[in-house]
Amino acid sequence: MKNLTIGAIFLIFFAVSAFASAPCPKKLADTTCPREPYSFEGMKRQEPIKGRNVGWFQCQATMTVHDPVTTAVLVTQPTFTFNLSTLYHNSCGCWKTVTTIPGDAVKMEYGNGLPGQAMYGSCFYATWADLAGNPVETVGFARNVVGVHRDLIYVSRATNELVVHQSIYPLGRDQVGDEYVLVRHFDPVTKGIDWVQAVYCTKIQDQLEPLP
């Protein structure tokens, strides 16, 4: 049985999912984030679904571990609760996502110079752990499925292979309020999904003005 630890499983959250067999856009061949600063309103235009719903959340996550070949469920983890905030800061021209997950680093999300909506609108660096606890450095690219949800893929900065796919669904009126997040991690050998995390985040407070 693979050695599972809560610290490895919940190493990173936002993370922020959904890419099938269609030809990959040229941007996916890149493993860097240009970190282009945007204004408070500019980030909202670039990533409208998340831009309308920045603020403070309390989240509850559950996770199932799967056999990446047979898809059988191997382990179901107990519910894990943490706080999360995604807030715009003038100092970087970006969103900073901070959680209370032990060991989780601050994620700084920038506009990537491409249109939002149906294309990739933002990017950031993030570290994900596999089931053995090995950290994998990734770059995350976000896009909006217009009027539906926010989609993110995370590719390895070393190999450009898909590591994690994440979908974020706003549940409130006008897509402001609580969020449901689905995270899928891919086994580096078989390329099948080896764990799935479902997260429900309750909105505590909106961010109405940028922070310094």
Swiss-Prot record:
Main location: virion
GO CC, any one term: virion component
Keyword Signal assigned: yes
Superkingdom of this protein's organism: Viruses
InterPro entries named in the record: DUF5859
Record key words, sorted: Signal, Virion
Name this polypeptide is given: Uncharacterized protein L274
Organism: Acanthamoeba polyphaga mimivirus
